Regions:
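Short coil-to-helix segment of the ABC ATPase nucleotide-binding domain corresponding to the Q-loop/switch region
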Residues: 101-109
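Catalytic Walker B motif of ABC-type/P-loop ATPase nucleotide-binding domains
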Residues: 169-172
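Conserved ABC ATPase signature
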Residues: 144-148, 152
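Conserved ABC ATPase "signature" region
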Residues: 71-72, 112, 119-140
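Helix-to-loop junction immediately C-terminal to a conserved catalytic motif
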Residues: 56
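Conserved catalytic motifs of ABC-family nucleotide-binding domains
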Residues: 165
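Conserved ABC transporter NBD signature motif
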Residues: 64-72
Length: 274
């Protein structure tokens, strides 16, 4: 425990993951604390998605250890991992909605199929409705994913990721393939989720604009919108940026330090700020 005595929600200790002869992650170590936001930048193939899947226990490290909520995931069986995963929301890069299910059924899926959730049957629909209202999709219960726009499908996937009210949420490139206005809407929802529910947030992205919004905006519950706030002003914990290159964590720190870096690899992300 550190960072002003906040509890570490997620910890990587010298984690290495290999696929064949390729090291997808190489000796990665970091801690994410309660209520902290972490923005993970890196080029395609740098290990960002592998890091999230390792945090979820979907990928086992070849060496090193991963801890979530103080428990060692590396030593767990698949059955034991189910309980941990019920505390982690995950938005996969492709959204991964079930095309044959309605939006209501998609969002309800974690409540009905994660054994550790214990949601009473009479509470499932209200929880689904609440999650969809939260992402401003209240009128889509009976629609199918194919009837929604790309941005709306992404918002429905966010609703499914947070319907169980997890304390840790992992987002894998939530704005990929979206136009700038829709991308801004998605990040605004992530900020809303973070600040209203006080979640720990890990955001993987190639877009520095996304990280800049996460770091410098907060949700105003009275106004019902996000508003500018200096990095760290929204609460005691500032946003931490991480940069991966070829599976290695080459940067971990605050936004000012990131923007002051002279590393050309890092600089190319910072130039995307506007």
């Amino acid at each position: 425990m550190s960072q002003d005595n906040h509890q570490a929600v997620l910890r990587f200790d010298r984690v290495t993951v290999t696929f064949g002869d390729v090291e997808a992650l190489s000796g990665v170590s970091f801690e994410a604390f309660e209520g902290e936001s972490r923005v993970i930048l890196g080029a395609a193939g740098s290990g960002k998605t592998v890091l999230l899947k390792t945090a979820l226990g979907l990928v086992k490290p070849d060496s090193g250890e991963v801890y979530a909520f103080g428990e060692n995931l590396t030593a767990m069986s698949e059955r034991q991992l189910f309980d941990i995963r019920s505390k982690i929301g995950m938005l996969f890069q492709e959204g991964a909605l079930f095309d044959s299910l309605t939006i209501q059924e998609n969002v309800a899926y974690p409540l009905l199929n994660q054994r550790s959730i214990h949601c009473p049957p009479e509470r499932v629909l209200p929880r689904v409705e609440e999650a969809l209202e939260f992402v401003e999709l209240g009128g889509t219960l009976e629609k199918f994913p194919s009837e929604l726009s790309g941005g709306m499908r992404r918002r429905a996937a966010i609703a499914r990721a947070v319907v169980t009210e997890p304390p840790l949420v992992l987002y894998d490139s939530p704005t990929a393939g979206l136009d700038p206005i829709t991308a801004h809407t998605i990040i605004a929802l992530l900020i809303k989720e973070r600040d209203v529910k006080q979640t720990t947030t890990l955001l993987v992205t190639q877009r520095y604009q996304d990280g800049n919004l996460i770091a410098n905006f907060r949700y105003n519950s009275k106004q019902g919108c996000i508003e500018p706030a200096r990095n760290g002003a929204r609460r005691t914990m500032p946003t931490t940026f991480m940069v991966l290159r070829d599976g290695r964590l080459i940067f971990e720190g605050g936004q000012d330090e990131l923007e002051g870096s002279h590393d050309p690899y890092i600089s190319k992300f910072v130039k995307q700020r506007v």
